[in-house]
């Protein structure tokens, strides 16, 4: 399972309505998405939820097709609600699971199964791995490194393997998980914004 994730710090100064480019919305969103944004009771959160859905889908799509580039309007968000959305792109259809609070929004995207299950059923199903957000307000160091270390801790715990045996390599900008002895099929995505880091991984361990 290919996975992509994105976190947005809703309180970060650079993400506030008066800080973004005046044409940001027009460049990022389709006509239907703009109508939804204009009609939203919470346009600030709606804006960054749409964005996180697109960004997380891009990360998942890039793993399927390395030639995919991030042109936000080409990632079309449909059926957005509190729990998730479906995103359409030339690379395929993707299901996005959403979590949010007053401080952040977190999106996790995976390719849509051909089994035909409803999106609402998929987003409510148990996640085969871990998807978490952590504050780094008091942490020191590079947020990318913090996200990586926390994700590796999570993978080791979730897969019941020794933390020292979990290794992370980069293929381009895509993280890949390696093990010394055990065979793992793990797909990992990392993200950070403002005071938050996030990760999502899915996988299984072979006996």
What are these regions, as identified by a protein language model?
Residues 1-207:
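Core catalytic alpha/beta fold that binds nucleotide/phospho-ligands
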């Amino acid at each position: 399972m290919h996975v992509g994730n994105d976190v947005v710090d809703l309180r970060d100064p650079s993400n506030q309505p008066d800080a973004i480019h005046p044409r940001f919305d027009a460049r990022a969103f389709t006509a239907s998405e703009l109508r939804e944004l204009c009609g939203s009771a919470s346009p600030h959160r709606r804006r960054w939820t749409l964005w996180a859905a697109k960004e997380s889908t891009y990360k998942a799509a890039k793993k399927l097709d390395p030639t995919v580039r991030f042109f936000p309007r080409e990632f079309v968000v449909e059926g957005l609600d509190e729990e998730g959305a479906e995103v359409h792109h030339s690379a395929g259809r993707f299901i996005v699971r959403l979590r949010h609070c007053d401080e952040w929004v977190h999106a996790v995207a995976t390719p849509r199964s051909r089994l035909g299950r409803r999106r609402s059923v998929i987003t409510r199903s148990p996640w085969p791995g871990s998807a978490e957000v952590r504050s780094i307000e008091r942490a020191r160091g590079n947020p990318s490194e913090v996200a990586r270390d926390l994700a590796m801790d999570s993978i080791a715990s979730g897969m019941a393997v020794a933390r020292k045996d979990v290794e992370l390599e980069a293929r381009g900008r895509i993280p890949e998980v390696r093990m010394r002895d055990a065979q793992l099929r793990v797909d990992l995505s990392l993200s950070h914004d403002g005071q938050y880091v996030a990760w999502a991984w899915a996988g299984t361990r072979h006996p």
